[in-house]
Design a protein with these regions (language model features):
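Acidic/polar, glycine-enriched structural segments that form the non-catalytic walls/loops
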Residues: 1-64, 136-139, 144-151, 155-160, ...
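Short acidic alpha-helix initiation/capping motifs at coil-to-helix transition points
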Residues: 8-17, 66-68, 223, 256, ...
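Non-catalytic C-terminal accessory modules of carbohydrate-active enzymes
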Residues: 283-288, 325, 329-468
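Extended glycan-interaction surfaces of carbohydrate-active proteins
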Residues: 19, 23-66, 89-121, 163-190, ...
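Aromatic-rich carbohydrate-recognition surfaces in CAZymes
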Residues: 64-170, 191-195, 199, 314-330, ...
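Structural helix-adjacent loops and short alpha-helical linkers that scaffold large soluble proteins
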Residues: 19-30, 78-91, 137-155, 207-226, ...
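Alpha-helical scaffold segments in carbohydrate-active enzymes
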Residues: 35-42, 93, 153-164, 197, ...
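Short, contiguous, pocket-lining structural segments
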Residues: 186-200, 217-220, 224, 256, ...
Length: 468
């Protein structure tokens, strides 16, 4: 079987077709940004008659097999590419292989499209993030018909998980390999991340149902979400430790401190008081606030490895993105920006010394993790692309509601050619003003330090003064 090969896209074409950031105070981040797109473009694959994958789709950069949770995270930055990196066909590769009972495998073979793992194996599932990935892409293209088309697959998959991965206490189980954190030192019966991810799944499904006008679906999934939220907080939250823990078969806490509990911020299951306790762990230099944040295992855990050893302390793009999006969800925007700046600086240092972007990184020095694959975009494009647009420049697009939220940073930044209603959107800020170009009127929600503004922006170019 011929090995998969990517397509070639000329760098000048990339710059013409993709969003172009303006980061005058951090030109090295711009270099990293474009390097990520160049590597990502090489991961656009062509399916074969033997595997029946899509004619073109973006791949996980891991040897040809397609991986469920990699693909879902890749959606978070590929969505800005106007399908230059074809993310929707990549997701369709999984839906097209769904079993009649709703099951979708975590990995399918390049050679023949077959499931790599036995269906009954605990390793055969991955975090249930398809609905979340579809919702992220929907925020850019605003195409409700796409959500309508994939709803049956998403709904069937959710219910397969409830029948096959839900425990008697209402929580969910997985294995280390199935969790995506392959060698994480956890052996619980109920896993906090998998349970919280299923809550996020239910929350997102309720939002998709609302878009589709499915009132019964909204009610079903909202009830699922609230029930699971209650069980997670009742059984997994430890008030003294300020942490969610995995549970053993007797519902006793298994206290291995990983990044898994921080999914709770993104899934909106926490109270403000819980947020502060979780933030304290992220801020703690003995745990997660290292030279390069955030290691996937706390640095004061006995299993922590300074060289990373995969999920025993390495810094990984998907979990960093999850944490950063969670920080924005609870309004911790300044901390998110500081964390992303550290993440990007570390990636730049390693790019300068090695010429490429890596699968994972060490938390305590500017180096790739051991082991780690080079040229990994793949999901390592999350920092240079998605976090630059969403955290450093500060932009969240909501095309369905014709609304842009801009968390304006103190320094001058900008971006042009964001995908927006079939055209381009440009946003630039200086110390004194904001400049916007849009092909149609939009609502702009500005968060500028303590100031909150909602502006109705007309089509074309407009300049407004920053609040003081």
């Amino acid at each position: 079987m011929t090995e998969p090969t990517g397509i070639y896209i000329d760098p000048s074409s990339l710059r013409e077709r993709l969003p172009r950031p303006y980061l005058p105070n951090n030109p090295a981040w711009e270099t990293l940004y474009w390097r990520a797109w160049e590597l990502g473009a090489k991961m656009v694959r062509a399916g074969t008659p033997t595997n029946s994958f899509a004619p073109q789709y973006v791949d996980a950069a891991f040897g040809g097999n397609i991986f469920q949770w990699d693909t879902c995270f890749i959606a978070a930055f590929a969505r800005y590419s106007r399908e230059l990196l074809p993310i929707l066909p990549a997701l369709d590769n999984f839906y097209g292989r769904q079993d009649a009972d709703g099951y979708i495998a975590r990995e399918y073979r390049w050679e023949n499209g077959a499931n790599l793992w036995a269906k009954g194996s605990g390793d055969s599932c991955n975090p249930p993030l398809f609905a979340w990935a579809e919702w992220l892409v929907y925020q850019i293209h605003g195409n409700a018909e796409r959500l309508r088309q994939v709803w049956p697959q998403l709904d069937a998959y959710y219910h397969w998980l409830t029948k096959n991965r839900r425990l008697d206490n209402g929580l969910y189980w997985i294995t280390d390999m199935g969790s995506g954190m392959d060698n994480t030192p956890r052996y619980g019966a109920a896993w906090c991340d998998y349970s919280i991810q299923q809550a996020l799944n239910a929350l997102t499904m309720s939002r998709i149902a609302a878009v589709l006008g499915d009132d019964a679906g909204v009610q079903t999934y909202r009830t699922e979400y609230e029930t699971l939220k209650m069980q997670i907080n009742t059984l997994m939250w430890d008030e003294n430790d300020g942490m969610y823990w995995d549970l053993d078969a007797g519902d006793l806490a298994m206290k291995v401190k990983t990044v898994a509990p921080f999914w709770a911020l993104l899934a909106e299951i926490t109270t403000p008081a819980q947020n502060q306790k979780l933030l304290a762990h992220l801020h703690d230099p003995d745990e997660f606030w290292r030279t390069h944040p955030f290691p996937t295992l706390a640095a004061n855990d006995r299993w922590y490895k300074t060289h990373g050893d995969y999920w025993l302390g390495a810094v990984w793009a998907p979990t960093n993105y999850m944490i950063v999006r969670g920080l924005h969800t609870i309004g911790a925007d300044d901390f998110a920006r500081e964390a992303v700046a550290r993440h990007l600086d570390a990636m730049v240092a390693v790019l300068d010394s090695t010429g490429t972007i890596w699968e994972n990184y060490r938390a305590d020095e500017m180096a790739a993790g051991i082991p780690a694959r080079p040229d990994f975009v793949g999901w390592s494009g999350l920092g240079p692309i998605a976090m630059v647009i969403e955290t450093i420049i500060g932009i969240d697009l909501d095309a369905p509601n014709n609304t842009v939220t801009w968390r304006v940073p103190p320094q001058s930044v900008g971006v042009e050619n964001l995908p927006w209603h079939g055209g381009r959107l440009d946003l630039f800020c200086s110390a004194d003003n904001l400049r916007i170009w849009s092909p149609k009127p939009l609502t702009l929600k500005v968060i500028d330090g303590p100031h909150r503004l909602t502006l109705e922006i007309l089509a074309g170019e407009r300049t407004v003064e920053r609040p003081s």
